Regions:
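Short coil/turn segments that connect the beta-strands within blades of beta-propeller domains
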Residues: 1-2, 53, 62, 113, ...
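Beta-rich catalytic cores
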Residues: 44, 51-52, 104, 111-112, ...
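Short glycine/serine- and acidic-residue-enriched loop/turn motifs that recur at repeat junctions
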Residues: 7-30, 68-90, 128-150, 188-212
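Conserved core positions of repeat-based scaffolds
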Residues: 6, 54-57, 66, 114-117, ...
Length: 212
């Protein structure tokens, strides 16, 4: 029915219930006793993802909402305030993430502390923690924790000349995309060769001229 239910640890509000109470570890907390996450009036979800302490959903209108831990801006709200751990933070009170003028999302992924969206035009945007270049911007600056970093101000990741993405994924500190020609590109943390470039520990995306 497009509703979302979450259970487990909620120390940062990642279950979206307006509190930090763990759910599912005691009797009578599941089933009909577990309220769905409030996504907003009349809204349902078509996809979900979760990081270590944050949750993300694409709604039926293509917008994206995220809640839980926000220490690195991974909720995309231009602040570092957690969402979902206090009353009246969810539902219509939670603004959709600004993906850019007229843009919607077709897929989302979440790393430890970063969030990735595949947009309707095949571009990819990422925000949150960027200590290893996992946001693909050629630097290590976090995105989404300050005003005016999202929306049209957030540059889509350079996937290469004329290239778009058809699928995305996120590791702890890395991001991957399947491109429209069937190739795969991965960037971010590379201590164990997880970027598949035959090198380590050379991270990719944390310096200029490493993407595209």
């Amino acid at each position: 029915n497009g509703t979302v239910k979450a259970f487990g640890r909620s120390n940062y509000g990642q279950l979206g219930q307006g509190n930090t109470a763990t759910i599912g570890d005691n009797a009578n907390e599941m089933g009909d006793n577990l309220a769905p996450v409030d996504l907003g009036s009349g809204r349902t979800a078509i996809a979900v993802a979760s990081g270590i302490y944050h949750s993300v959903a694409i709604l039926d209108n293509g917008t994206v909402k995220a809640w839980g831990s926000n220490s690195y801006g991974q909720l995309g709200q231009g602040s570092s305030a957690n969402i979902g751990d206090g009353a009246n933070e969810m539902g219509d009170n939670l603004a959709a993430i600004d993906l850019g003028s007229g843009r919607t999302a077709t897929a989302v992924a979440a790393g430890y502390y970063h969030t990735v969206a595949l947009l309707d035009n095949g571009t990819v945007k990422a925000w949150g923690q960027n200590n290893y270049g996992q946001l693909g911007q050629g630097n290590t600056t976090n995105i989404g924790d300050n005003a005016n970093e999202m929306g049209d101000n957030l540059t889509a990741i350079d996937l290469g000349s004329g290239r778009t993405a058809t699928a995305i994924a996120a590791g702890l500190y890395s991001t991957a995309a399947v491109l429209d020609d069937g190739t795969v590109k991965i960037w971010g943390y590379n201590a164990y060769g997880q970027l598949g470039q035959g090198t380590s520990p050379n991270n990719i995306g944390d310096n200029a001229n490493e993407m595209g």
